[in-house]
Curated annotation (Swiss-Prot):
Keywords: Developmental protein, Karyogamy, Mitochondrion, Ribonucleoprotein, Ribosomal protein, RNA-binding, rRNA-binding, Transit peptide. GO terms for biological process: karyogamy; polar nucleus fusion; translation. CDD domains: Ribosomal_L18_L5e. Belongs to the universal ribosomal protein uS11 family. Residues 34-138 are annotated as: Disordered. GO terms for cellular component: mitochondrion; ribonucleoprotein complex; ribosome. This is Small ribosomal subunit protein uS11m. Residues 103-114 have a biased composition (Low complexity). Disruption phenotype: Failure of fusion of the polar nuclei during megagametogenesis. Required for karyogamy during female gametophyte development, when the two polar nuclei fuse to form the diploid central cell nucleus. Residues 50-63 have a biased composition (Polar residues).
Length: 314
């Protein structure tokens, strides 16, 4: 007894027939029949509910129907199970095709029917149950028309509504940020402030007052002061005395705001004392006034470029 006869004699015969629909009647084989070579038939049992639905269909290729002159139209259960005849000539289901299911897992099976996708998605074209559909002609025409309109709009210099919306959002953000930062008042930065150049050397100190363009207004050195001539100009307080003298002269000239630039290969403590001495000479040691708006150290910094000269032997 082969596998087909075992399927036919099983208790789930009706479920097997319903699962492989399109059969009007079933021939029950005897135990001496193989089901394929044409054994003896005992009775034909029609399937309930199937005769009325399939009365208009032809009996070609069904088991138990009258044979046709063309024997190639007859198919076995193996062919039906493999789904070889699941599509007709004009794209319709064949009489012996397996039934369709609206389950989402049906598209993964090898016997998915071509009309399954059309049943689950009636608005989309049929692609044979593969789950993918080619774009229709109307959607392609709409896409080409929209792209042509965008090109014409860009060529004519027009601006789309999307760009206008983005521009409005940017303008609103600019107004908000401007409103936030308007509460913070910027200090009055002096653009044409005079500059005080303090150059501190080992044996002398040079202090020069210039305008914003570099024109010299006044200058002084440690040796120019009457009290610091000779060896006294090499003392520690010579830079402070020179800066204080220039502070008094700058006050007499009517300067209001200055920028101090210090230069010298020494620690910043001496530079700080010179800057404070200039402020005291300008304000007559009054702490409520300060003409200095900016301080900058312009000392050159070596980046191991040139070799230093040989140190002097003592």
């Amino acid at each position: 007894m082969n596998g087909v006869s075992r399927h036919l004699r099983a208790s789930s015969l009706l479920s097997l027939i319903r699962s492989y629909g399109g059969i009007n009647s079933v021939c029950r084989f005897s135990s001496q029949s193989d089901g394929f070579s044409g054994g003896r038939f005992r009775e034909q049992v029609p399937v309930s509910g199937e005769s009325a639905n399939n009365s208009g269909l032809s009996n070609t290729g069904r088991i138990g129907s009258s044979p046709e002159p063309n024997p190639s139209t007859l198919r076995t259960f193996g062919d039906m199970k493999a789904g070889l005849l699941n599509r007709g000539v004009n794209g319709f289901s064949a009489p012996n095709a397996p039934p369709t299911f609206k389950s989402s897992l049906r598209s993964r099976l090898p016997n998915s029917l071509p009309d399954q996708f059309g049943q689950t998605n009636p608005g989309l074209p049929n692609t044979g149950g593969s789950g993918f559909s080619a774009p229709s002609l109307s959607s392609y025409e709409n896409f080409t028309q929209s792209s042509s309109l965008l090109k014409e709009n860009s060529r004519s210099g027009g601006k789309s509504s999307d760009l206008d919306f983005v521009r409005e959002v940017i303008e609103d953000e600019g107004r908000r940020t401007a409103g936030i930062f308007s509460h913070f008042q910027r200090p009055n930065l002096e653009t044409n402030a005079d500059i005080i150049h303090i150059k501190m050397l080992r044996n002398n100190t040079f202090v020069t007052v210039t305008d914003s363009k570099g024109n010299v207004k006044c200058k002084a050195t440690s040796g120019s002061l009457p009290d610091l001539k000779g060896g006294r100009k090499m003392t520690n307080y010579t830079a402070d005395a020179t800066a204080e003298n220039i502070g008094r002269r700058a006050k007499a000239m009517g300067l209001k705001s200055v920028v101090v630039k210090v230069n010298g290969f020494t620690h910043f403590g001496k530079k700080k004392k010179a800057i404070i001495a200039f402020r005291d000479g300008f304000t007559n040691s009054r702490s409520d006034q300060n003409p200095i708006v900016y301080i900058e150290d312009t000392t050159r910094k070596a980046h191991n470029g040139c070799r230093l000269p040989r140190k002097r032997r003592v």
